[in-house]
């Protein structure tokens, strides 16, 4: 009996989405041959809501291993809005269930991050056959040691830090580099260590601006004419850590320095140390381009494992890597949870041993 398998990509794009789609498809065709049909849901959950999907053929999955982005398109559809009926009077959950039924799907694979997994769990609870695949450059999905897209983003952010070193040294500047990661600092921590940042500021560890400035001044006294500060976009100071998120975000907006801490840190460092300070924001560059060799392998592992789950009809789960082994977690166990950098993380110990300031 034929199985009809839906695939969607949701949330922010990242390297490895197409490689994972390919891994799923090639493994399904290899294992099930003509007994599988693949349906592409376009533009994430938006396509599932609006009934926007297309029949896929084996040809659609050729030549996409190295391709960045996603051939299915993606869109952010916040989980908090899934049960909210807006001006268009569309019941989103009912609409998604209808599309699933209209497309005659036997199961749906959802590739995405934390928000995607929350909606995937919701659909699973509503009775749909769902399998998740963990995608995010933030590496913050609970229950898996790594997500596809993360290692490529580390490579990109590291190259930015590498290149900033030469201009910082040439101009005797402090350079603040803003790295993606709103709730978790994995990307900043890894790229900061790999790129030789002198100060690394993470969302999990509220910083004291005086300690940041002291670290810059210590380097200057030891003969260094520049410093590199890697700042996670979700970094906050000790005062903000005591406040509700919406309150400190509003306070930042009122100050006219943007919603991230980077500009304010740069301004304070220049004022307190007297050293010329600049900000570099690589932004969406960290999401773009071809996946690294590591992410291609990981995506293929995850995709082929998801195909196995389809074949054995194991639903309500998401793929994970735990202690070097590809496995699965129940969606209900991981949805709505964030994998943060723990205080006991070995890389934090490494950073401290190396004299890196953590704020």
Model-derived regions: residue spans:
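Accessory alpha-helical/coil subdomains and C-terminal extensions
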Residues: 99, 110-112, 120-122, 129, ...
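Alpha-helix capping and helix-loop boundary segments enriched in small/acidic/polar residues
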Residues: 12-15, 87, 114, 144-152, ...
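Short glycine/serine/threonine-rich phosphate/pyrophosphate-binding segments
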Residues: 14-24, 48-49, 93-94, 105-121, ...
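Flexible loop/turn connectors
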Residues: 302-311
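A cross-family phosphate/adenosyl-ligand binding-site feature
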Residues: 1-9, 20-104, 115, 237-242, ...
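Glycine/threonine-rich beta-strand-loop-alpha-helix active-site module
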Residues: 25-58, 126-163
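Short, ordered loop/turn segments at secondary-structure junctions
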Residues: 10-13, 41-46, 76-77, 113-116, ...
């Amino acid at each position: 009996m034929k199985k009809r398998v839906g695939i969607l990509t949701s949330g922010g794009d990242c390297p490895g989405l197409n490689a994972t789609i390919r891994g799923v498809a090639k493994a399904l065709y290899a294992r099930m041959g003509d007994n599988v049909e693949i349906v592409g849901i376009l533009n994430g959950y938006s396509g599932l809501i609006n009934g926007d999907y297309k029949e896929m053929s084996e040809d659609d999955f050729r030549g996409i291993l190295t391709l960045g982005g996603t051939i299915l398109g993606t869109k952010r559809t916040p989980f908090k809005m899934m049960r909210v009926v807006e001006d268009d009077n569309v019941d989103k959950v009912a609409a998604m269930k209808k599309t699933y039924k209209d497309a005659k799907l036997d199961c749906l694979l959802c590739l995405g991050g934390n928000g995607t997994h929350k909606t995937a769990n919701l659909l699973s609870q509503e009775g749909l056959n769902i399998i998740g695949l963990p995608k995010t450059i933030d590496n913050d999905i609970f229950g898996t040691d790594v997500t596809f897209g993360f290692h490529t983003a580390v490579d990109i952010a590291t190259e930015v830090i590498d290149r900033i070193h030469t201009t910082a040294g040439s101009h005797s500047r402090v350079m603040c580099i803003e790295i993606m990661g709103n709730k978790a600092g994995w990307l900043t921590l890894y790229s900061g260590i790999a790129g030789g940042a002198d100060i690394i500021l993470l969302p999990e560890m509220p910083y004291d601006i005086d300690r940041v400035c002291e670290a810059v001044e210590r380097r200057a006294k030891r003969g260094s004419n520049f410093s590199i500060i890697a700042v996670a976009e979700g970094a906050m100071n000790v005062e903000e850590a005591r406040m509700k998120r919406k309150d400190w975000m509003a306070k930042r907006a009122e100050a006219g320095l943007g919603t991230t801490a980077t500009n304010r840190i740069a301004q304070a460092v220049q004022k307190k140390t007297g050293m010329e300070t600049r900000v570099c924001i690589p932004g969406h560059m960290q999401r773009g381009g071809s996946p690294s060799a590591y992410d291609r392998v990981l995506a293929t592992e995850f995709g082929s494992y998801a195909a196995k789950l389809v074949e054995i009809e194991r639903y309500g789960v998401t793929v994970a890597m735990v202690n070097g082994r590809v496995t699965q977690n129940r969606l209900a166990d991981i949805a709505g949870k964030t994998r943060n950098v723990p205080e006991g993380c070995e890389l934090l110990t490494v950073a401290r041993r190396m004299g890196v300031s953590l704020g």
